[in-house]
Amino acid sequence: MLVDPASVPTAVPDPVTPALGDLLVSAWESGALQAALDVSPGAATPPVGPVRAELAGVGESFAAWRLAPLPSMPSAPTAMTRPTAPTGKTAPTGPASFILRVPHVPVSALPRSLAQEIAALAHAPTGVGPAPVGAHDDASTSPLGLPVVLTADVPGAAARPSSWTSAHLRSHAHHLARLHSVPAPGRGPVMPGPEPWAAVPAGPQSLLTEVEAEAEGWRAAVIGAPDVSGLEPLIDAALARVARIEPQIAQLDGFVLSHGDLCATNILWDGVDVAGRPAVQYIDFEWAQGDDPARDLANLGGSVHGGPWYVPLTEEQVAGFVGAYVDARAALAREAGSGELPDSVADVGALRERMRAWTAYDRMAMLAHVASRAAESEMHRRVLPQLRGTLAAELGLPD
């Protein structure tokens, strides 16, 4: 990676404004952006040439820009075209399009380095998520003045939580089983290089220590926020729910590569696959790491929901979703000749108990975030009472 100091801007545009798009086009067409990337192993450096940039979406931490090469641009190298998804579709023959994501929150607030996100994508089965291209973590030497992560584009759109059907749940269960077919030795990030699990601590794993530390952040985040009365009992109840599964986490025998933030907004749908199911892929792997498979299962939704993130599901629907996932994991294990499922998946009762603890953890974290944003965001202000009410009901507390 070589960075020309002259390519680093002296003023950094807001990541969601047209000024950033203009700077992005300039950096791409000059080749400065490509030169700055730490390219993922097996990926080719994106070609230099004319490109159109458009804001594809804004999430809780990142703004995503779509880069569409213009027709005069030479075709991208084969390694950079979008991989064929497991849907029977053919990969595009023309230039690939790309998604470049830039954080609109402080880098210190991100759960992982961007290089670790790219490493996780490189470790995932082909077609589960976007093909990784590369990242640049250092804002001071970035041609945009911001950290960047670049992947191939993924077709499709997120479905509204209220529009999910049983077919969506089955497709998601099968796709998630493919992601979780990658084993991990414990809870921790995926590292670049030849030893992807080098940062996973040895010995018994823990979740409670992480949640206890997060709880201090939740309390700090909502100080002075409007309409946050009653959050302290929710925090205590969430901690108690996690404490009950700590012995399971310490003895768990089947950690996997986990997406870590697999809510509805990070699940894209595009037509149907060869089996006639809705075709699905995942995006935004910034939380990806080795973890308990129950985490991704819980993040979809269930009884605790609100906003665009969580799918409201009955107990019967959750049971069907989990059953489809377990069956898909078993089928993949048979195909691979790897024998029986680990108890972390085969013991469905224990899996469901851990899902309930992960639900308490994840929704409490989101509730604290939503409460901290409610004063400045009408959407977060609207979501706050529903998310708080459904979490309180799940934890057996009055709203």
Report each predicted region and the residues it spans:
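An alpha-helical support segment within catalytic cores of ATP-dependent transferases
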Residues: 16-46, 182-260, 270-273, 347
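Active-site activation/catalytic loop segments of kinase-like enzymes and analogous catalytic loops
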Residues: 294-337, 359-377
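ATP-binding pocket architecture of kinase catalytic cores
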Residues: 54-84, 89-202
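Helical subdomain adjoining the active site within ATP-dependent kinase catalytic cores
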Residues: 340-343, 365-399
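Active-site acidic catalytic loop and adjacent metal/ATP-binding pocket
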Residues: 56-69, 99-100, 240-295
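Hydrophobic alpha-helical segments that form the core
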Residues: 197-200, 204, 355-368
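Intrinsically disordered, low-complexity terminal tails and inter-domain linkers enriched
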Residues: 34-49, 70-96, 272-277, 330-347
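Actinobacteria-biased recognition of intrinsically disordered, low-complexity terminal regions
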Residues: 1-18, 74-92, 399
